[in-house]
Amino acid sequence: MGSSADTETAMIIATPASNHNNPATNGGDANQNHTSGAILALTNSESDASKKRRMGVLPLEVGTRVMCQWRDGKYHPVKVIERRKNYNGGHNDYEYYVHYTEFNRRLDEWIKLEQLDLDSVECALDEKVEDKVTSLKMTRHQKRKIDETHVEGHEELDAASLREHEEFTKVKNIATIELGKYEIETWYFSPFPPEYNDCVKLFFCEFCLSFMKRKEQLQRHMRKCDLKHPPGDEIYRSSTLSMFEVDGKKNKVYAQNLCYLAKLFLDHKTLYYDVDLFLFYILCECDDRGCHMVGYFSKEKHSEEAYNLACILTLPPYQRKGYGKFLIAFSYELSKKEGKVGTPERPLSDLGLVSYRGYWTRILLDILKKHKGNISIKELSDMTAIKAEDILSTLQSLELIQYRKGQHVICADPKVLDRHLKAAGRGGLDVDVSKMIWTPYKEQS
């Protein structure tokens, strides 16, 4: 880095100066003075060469890899994704949009030149988009945090679509949003209408989800907005928690705005503009000011594959409170009331599978612990609304299934069940089914 090189030079320059003032060396060996002068000249030469080399790499090309100082004060490897000219600066004065290669893409950000260690620059690579966004070298705390805050969206993308998606969405267009009492840093690109291309921050009405460019616009809107909760029917109320069912066809603008908002925190997902086909279940914390959205899930009105959940999100300020687990559990309670088995939309990401595997493990093993006698996978499916294939894969992953005489047999030793239940973690908030007031969706003629 430039700063460390300057410090090192100052220290070396000071050395002959102190020798010159030392009576023991002042008039000593001429060779020693000559050597000191040579060190000084060499150091200055190296310093100039280093400075020229660092300046010679500017401006950095897209694809360049370099070390960058992050919020923790430490340097981490990054890849330059995009750059933009700082028109108030000099010829090589750019800001750079970087991806921290050790971390998830949601931490990508614009950084200034002084955050970069130019001595660590590696030549730009000729690559369009990485095949996968890496998430390497995570501590156990970071891994747990990502597991718990992971959000599952509409379709996962195949490899070709993934590359195209990453190229199109490589730079976050909105840096922050204001929603209710929170200012939230966004994670990913969201395809807002073109008139919002120049916005770094958006202001959302937390009740109708209309979004504006300026705070004053939001303040004027809030004086006129009559909503104090999401549109649609309140289908659940327990203490300060409420759930609202919103029909995408009846409340199209709200549903579309919800999708724009959600995409800021969802990666590698398809944003569905045809919201008519979906029902949205909005979870809220309620107080005397109204019902404040903390998260939601969506589901297709009619799914041939028996999907009971298409997209799920807990907003960042409300994560790690058990709301994600609550939303998953609620989707299965709806399936029970429909008299159907359900499963989340496929394919699941690795972390999405972790979330669901945890839910399935807790539900199934709790039943097996309490049940006396034999029980079949079909009976478990009927009791839980979990699809038989999900039950089988979960129990197989826990090594609780054996194949005997042409059929699968569940082997449930109590100590083994306790060990797996402990590993699955807490179940989060309970859904009090006695507080649900809901009837399955029927298309109106």
UniProtKB/Swiss-Prot annotation:
Protein source organism: Arabidopsis thaliana (Mouse-ear cress)
N6-acetyllysine: modified positions: K269
Function: Histone acetyltransferase which may be involved in transcriptional activation. Acetylates 'Lys-5' of histone H4 (H4K5ac). Essential for gametophyte development. Involved in DNA repair after UV-B exposure. Negative regulator of flowering controlling the H4K5ac levels in the FLC chromatin.
Family statement drawn from the similarity comment of this UniProt entry: Belongs to the MYST (SAS/MOZ) family.
Amino acids binding acetyl-CoA: I312, L313, T314, Q319, R320, K321, G322, Y323, G324, K325, S349
Note: Knockdown expression of both HAM1 and HAM2 results in earlier flowering.
Record note on modification: Autoacetylation at Lys-269 is required for proper function.
Protein name as catalogued: Histone acetyltransferase of the MYST family 1
Tissue-specificity statement: Expressed in cotyledons, leaves, stems, roots and, at higher levels in developing flowers, particularly in the anthers and gynoecia. Constitutively expressed in all tissues, predominantly in shoot apical meristem.
Any GO molecular function: zinc ion binding
Active site: E345
Cystine connections: none
